């Protein structure tokens, strides 16, 4: 997992509440458990004018010109600004995978569905919670200023606007440690690899009959 320390990125505003995981990555694309290949199908039903299917050449599909991620001013965005209850619906790690592979490192919203919120941290995506009034103001500023960027400092737990105003956010210390150091569940386990091997060697000596 890529470490998350500091980043400055273009903001894309997704002005819709209660965006569920099937809208983030539709169910027909969930057949793979690899973490790659989902970016082109992020928000598939909104980005394209046809019905997407696995294995399609997305470069040949008709784009929906009204969808925010298809607008030229938001190309290359790495910060997604969203509304309340983002990531609701069924549990699927494919949702943060798709957001990450598209290029988003950060989502900012007033609230999230619990399972999506937890899955995001485990997959290198930082979901920031800000008060609704601050999110409303960010939407106004993003829409009024082309090329609007935010700077996020995870260690300091701050979001800095272009006008210099600093917004603080809360994050669980353990989740913060994992993101700063790029540690997913496998990475955390491998930190104790020596202790695990020592236990296995000792257990093999104590219970040799189990290994015959």
Curated annotation (Swiss-Prot):
<dbReference type="InterPro" id="IPR050075">
    <property type="entry name" value="LeuD"/>
</dbReference>
<comment type="pathway">
    <text>Amino-acid biosynthesis; L-leucine biosynthesis; L-leucine from 3-methyl-2-oxobutanoate: step 2/4.</text>
</comment>
<comment type="similarity">
    <text>Belongs to the LeuD family. LeuD type 1 subfamily.</text>
</comment>
<dbReference type="GO" id="GO:0009098">
    <property type="term" value="P:L-leucine biosynthetic process"/>
</dbReference>
<dbReference type="InterPro" id="IPR000573">
    <property type="entry name" value="AconitaseA/IPMdHydase_ssu_swvl"/>
</dbReference>
<dbReference type="Pfam" id="PF00694">
    <property type="entry name" value="Aconitase_C"/>
</dbReference>
<dbReference type="InterPro" id="IPR015928">
    <property type="entry name" value="Aconitase/3IPM_dehydase_swvl"/>
</dbReference>
<dbReference type="GO" id="GO:0003861">
    <property type="term" value="F:3-isopropylmalate dehydratase activity"/>
</dbReference>
<keyword id="KW-0432">Leucine biosynthesis</keyword>
<keyword id="KW-0100">Branched-chain amino acid biosynthesis</keyword>
<comment type="subunit">
    <text>Heterodimer of LeuC and LeuD.</text>
</comment>
<dbReference type="GO" id="GO:0009316">
    <property type="term" value="C:3-isopropylmalate dehydratase complex"/>
</dbReference>
<comment type="function">
    <text>Catalyzes the isomerization between 2-isopropylmalate and 3-isopropylmalate, via the formation of 2-isopropylmaleate.</text>
</comment>
<keyword id="KW-0456">Lyase</keyword>
<keyword id="KW-0028">Amino-acid biosynthesis</keyword>
<dbReference type="InterPro" id="IPR033940">
    <property type="entry name" value="IPMI_Swivel"/>
</dbReference>
<protein>
    <recommendedName>
        <fullName>3-isopropylmalate dehydratase small subunit</fullName>
        <ecNumber>4.2.1.33</ecNumber>
    </recommendedName>
</protein>
<dbReference type="InterPro" id="IPR004431">
    <property type="entry name" value="3-IsopropMal_deHydase_ssu"/>
</dbReference>
């Amino acid at each position: 997992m890529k470490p998350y320390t500091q980043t400055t990125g273009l903001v894309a505003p997704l002005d819709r509440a209660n965006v569920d995981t099937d809208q983030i990555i539709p169910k027909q694309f969930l057949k793979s458990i690899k973490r790659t290949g989902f970016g082109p199908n992020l928000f598939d039903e909104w980005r394209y004018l046809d019905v997407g299917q696995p294995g399609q050449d997305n470069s040949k599909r008709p784009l929906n010109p009204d969808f925010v991620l298809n607008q030229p001013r938001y190309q290359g965005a790495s910060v997604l600004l969203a509304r309340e209850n983002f990531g609701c619906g069924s549990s699927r790690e494919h949702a943060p995978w798709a957001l990450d592979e598209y290029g988003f490192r950060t989502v900012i919203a007033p609230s999230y569905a619990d399972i999506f919120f937890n899955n995001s941290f485990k997959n290198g995506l930082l979901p920031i919670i800000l008060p609704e009034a601050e999110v409303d103001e960010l939407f106004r500023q993003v829409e009024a200023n082309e090329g609007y960027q935010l700077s996020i400092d995870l260690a300091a737990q701050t979001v800095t606007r272009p006008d210099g105003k600093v917004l603080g956010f809360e994050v669980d210390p353990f989740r913060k440690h994992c993101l700063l150091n790029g540690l997913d569940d496998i990475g955390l386990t491998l930190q104790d690899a020596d202790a695990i091997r020592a236990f296995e060697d000792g257990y093999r000596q104590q219970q040799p009959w189990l290994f015959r």
